[in-house]
């Protein structure tokens, strides 16, 4: 369609149409039907006015090109196709000189003979429907409406067609030709169906009474009336010279617009310092599961029963000892806490009946680990407002940390496939309407690509842990409840599987506000030796608790089993979001859908099936120091999902700030790649705002390093 438009219409018309679309942020390459419609409308407006003049007696005459009388006055003033500001200026000056009522919308033409504005319509639908829409929109008796259709029909206000028969026939013939040309190229059907109803762009509401008085009172300084302010706003040209506009707005602003060139941007400065450490609420790639297949034991589905059953599958327990202490903590307490969990689980087994929940004894080690009695006493402000040296705690600035390689490994692992399926097909909601047939097809394809993904395991694990912790926090506020960390999946053969990752012990949880914190101690199984990357485990105390026999290609090998223990905390609002982690599936599905939509609109048919089934095609996944990484559509789905999941797992104010500020720089760089000649002011301030968020958060630091790779490749 785009090629057709460029061949079929005069280059000046094409250029005006492109400019008009850009002004409203639309892309002629994507919205090709709209591009064709705008060109057609422009051409009809120009043909309407061509060859029509007014002679000395004020009569309308037709003068063919090349006629010596061409110095006569044009009968029509063309308003359509002009810059908005210029167009309003023309309209205002016509109204001032002729006394005609000012229209609410920009009309297309002014007729000097009949002294009226004209609104031209070109429709692919019924002329009378379109006529009514136009009339409804402009609500003005004074503006004359004239509608043409591609089938040769026309309709005008009071059946007054303004022009002679021959001039109108020229327009109808041209429209018919355009239609035939489109049809012969197979473009007509899509063009005909794409017409929407009238779009209201620039209506001027009349404000009266009290609202009018309020409007006059609430104007910015230096404006005497609402009219005066409106005229100023209308004259504000969106693509004009920004410096001048800024200085008009305020005397204090002096912005120099600097052109943004390939050589302008510098890489983001990542902080120096010790390597960053793991801060997720549970272990990710380092987690180890004790699992039971096809669970059918008594009380199956009750977490404590499931946990005990999983613990019994392992026989390699040994006397625990500390292999990597926590720098600041009392490490023997972590060791005692684990021993207490083992002992209390043993007590349950020795008992008559297994209870549904287990509250731990409030031992000194657990009180210490859960920060019991550590919170400063709260005092009523009334009792202490007279204290002379009342002040807020001094809090230390966070220590800057450098990017460590482990976070990229975590991300890569999250994109990988596991040998189990973590979601059923219905995790993403059901169809409601027939239109959703395509949607459910897309959803099923997408689910097939991500159901086995490790990021999906993290979602289900996060949902489970947060739900269990929030429940316990509300149901057993004063108790140190033992909460197993469990997930469920299906094997490749479709057998159900229940997995135990470890345990959480919850502290006191009188959570009145969304941000009130509940402390918990997490104890998680792992085969990762913490001494390989001690910086990653700074916040953990790691115990060696057993030996596990693993089947490998060379036979069975024994590997030490570790327990990662740490004190952590969360809040009602964080748990609420954690319970909603399935939204990550939806977010990444929507990103994939927009890719499919873009492809479908280029091909002018739905390409969902080809998109997922054409295994040979590769898609851009992301930037790395090597360049743009590409992969299969499944890999794209899993990468987008992993990004969304990590945004949830590593949510933080640093991430919020970095995402918002770096996006501005990203848009400027993309504008440069699209040859839009972007300009900036205070680019230094933008860099400062971005880099202020690069402190110590592993996920933010990784995103910043990806951003630098993007800058390098984007500007080559």
UniProtKB/Swiss-Prot annotation:
Belongs to the influenza viruses PA family. Keywords: Cap snatching, Endonuclease, Eukaryotic host gene expression shutoff by virus, Eukaryotic host transcription shutoff by virus, Host cytoplasm, Host gene expression shutoff by virus, Host nucleus, Host-virus interaction, Hydrolase, Inhibition of host RNA polymerase II by virus, Manganese, Metal-binding, Nuclease, Phosphoprotein. The gene is PA. InterPro entries: INFV_PA, PA/PA-X, PA/PA-X_sf. GO terms for molecular function: endonuclease activity; metal ion binding; RNA binding. This is Polymerase acidic protein. A motif (Nuclear localization signal 1 (NLS1)) lies at residues 124-139. Mn(2+) 1 binds at residues 41, 108, 119-120. GO terms for cellular component: host cell cytoplasm; host cell nucleus. Its cofactor is Mn(2+). It is found in: Host cytoplasm; Host nucleus. Phosphorylated on serines and threonines by host kinases, including human casein kinase II. Its EC number is 3.1.-.-. GO terms for biological process: cap snatching; DNA-templated transcription; symbiont-mediated suppression of host gene expression; symbiont-mediated suppression of host mRNA transcription via inhibition of RNA polymerase II activity; viral RNA genome replication; viral translational frameshifting. Influenza RNA polymerase is composed of three subunits: PB1, PB2 and PA. Interacts (via C-terminus) with PB1 (via N-terminus). Its main location: host cell. It comes from Influenza A virus (strain A/Duck/England/1/1956 H11N6). Pfam families: Flu_PA.
């Amino acid at each position: 369609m785009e090629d057709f438009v460029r061949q079929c219409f005069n280059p000046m018309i094409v250029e005006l149409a492109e400019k008009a679309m850009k002004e409203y942020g639309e892309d002629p390459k994507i919205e090709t039907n709209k591009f064709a419609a705008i060109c057609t409308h422009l051409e009809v407006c120009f043909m309407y006015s061509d060859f029509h003049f007014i002679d000395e007696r004020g009569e309308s005459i037709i003068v063919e090109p090349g006629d010596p009388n061409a110095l006569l006055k044009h009968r029509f003033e063309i308003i359509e196709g002009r810059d908005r500001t210029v167009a309003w200026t023309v309209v205002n000056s016509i109204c001032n000189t002729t006394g005609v009522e000012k229209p609410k919308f920009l009309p297309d033409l002014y007729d000097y003979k009949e002294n009226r504005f004209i609104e031209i319509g070109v429709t692919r639908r019924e002329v009378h429907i379109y006529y009514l829409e136009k009339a409804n929109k402009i609500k003005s008796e004074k503006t004359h409406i004239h509608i043409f259709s591609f089938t040769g029909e026309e309709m005008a206000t009071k059946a007054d067609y303004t022009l002679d028969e021959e001039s109108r026939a020229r327009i109808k013939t041209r429209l018919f030709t355009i239609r035939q040309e489109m049809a012969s190229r197979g473009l007509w059907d899509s063009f005909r169906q794409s017409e929407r109803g009238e779009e209201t762009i620039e209506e001027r509401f009349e404000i009266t009474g009290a609202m009018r008085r309020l409007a006059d009172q609430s104007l910015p300084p230096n404006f005497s009336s609402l009219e005066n302010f409106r005229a100023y706003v209308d004259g504000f040209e969106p693509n004009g010279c920004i410096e001048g506009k800024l200085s008009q707005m305020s005397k204090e602003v002096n912005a120099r617009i600097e052109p943004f060139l390939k050589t302008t941007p510098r890489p983001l400065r990542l902080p120096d310092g010790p390597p960053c450490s793991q801060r997720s609420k549970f272990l990710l790639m380092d987690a180890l599961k004790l699992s039971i297949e096809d669970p059918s034991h008594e009380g199956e589905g009750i977490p404590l029963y499931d946990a005990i059953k999983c613990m019994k599958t392992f026989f390699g327990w040994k006397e625990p000892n500390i292999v990597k202490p926590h720098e600041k903590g009392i490490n023997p307490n972590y060791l005692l806490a684990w021993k207490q969990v083992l002992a209390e689980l043993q007590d349950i087994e020795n008992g008559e009946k297994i209870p549904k929940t287990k509250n731990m004894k409030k031992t000194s080690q657990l009180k210490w680990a859960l920060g019991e009695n550590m919170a400063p006493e709260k005092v009523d402000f009334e009792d202490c407002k007279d204290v002379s040296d009342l002040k807020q705690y001094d809090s230390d600035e966070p220590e800057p940390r450098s990017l460590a390689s482990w976070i990229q490994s975590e991300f890569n692992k999250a994109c990988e496939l596991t040998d189990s399926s973590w979601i059923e097909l219905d995790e993403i909601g059901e169809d409601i309407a027939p239109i959703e047939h395509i949607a459910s097809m897309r959803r099923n394809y997408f689910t097939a690509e991500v159901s086995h993904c490790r990021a999906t395991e993290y979602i289900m694990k996060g949902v489970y842990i947060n739900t269990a912790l929030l429940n316990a926090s509300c149901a057993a506020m004063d108790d140190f409840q033992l909460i197993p960390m469990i997930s469920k999946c299906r094997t490749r053969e479709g057998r159900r599987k229940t997995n135990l990752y470890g345990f959480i012990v919850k502290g006191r949880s009188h959570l009145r506000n969304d941000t009130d914190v509940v402390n918990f101690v997490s104890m998680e199984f792992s085969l990762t030796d913490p001494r390989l990357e001690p910086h990653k485990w700074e916040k953990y105390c790691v115990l060696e608790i057993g030996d596990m026999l693993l089947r490998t290609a060379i036979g069975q090998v024994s590997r030490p089993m570790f327990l990662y223990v740490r004190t952590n905390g969360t809040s009602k609002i964080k748990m609420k979001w954690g319970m909603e982690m399935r939204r990550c599936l939806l977010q990444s599905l929507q990103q994939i859908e927009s890719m499919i939509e873009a492809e479908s609109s280029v091909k002018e048919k739905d390409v969902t099936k080809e998109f997922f089934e054409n295994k040979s095609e590769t898609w851009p996944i992301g930037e790395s120091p090597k360049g743009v990484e590409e992969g299969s559509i499944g890999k794209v789905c899993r990468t987008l999902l992993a990004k969304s999941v990590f945004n949830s797992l590593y949510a933080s104010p640093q991430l919020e700030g970095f995402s918002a500020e770096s996006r501005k720089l990203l848009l400027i760089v993309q504008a440069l790649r699209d040859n839009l000649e972007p300009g900036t002011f205070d680019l230094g301030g933008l860099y400062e705002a971005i880099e202020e968020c690069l402190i110590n958060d592993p996920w933010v630091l990784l995103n910043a390093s990806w951003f630098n790779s993007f800058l390098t490749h984007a500007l080559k």
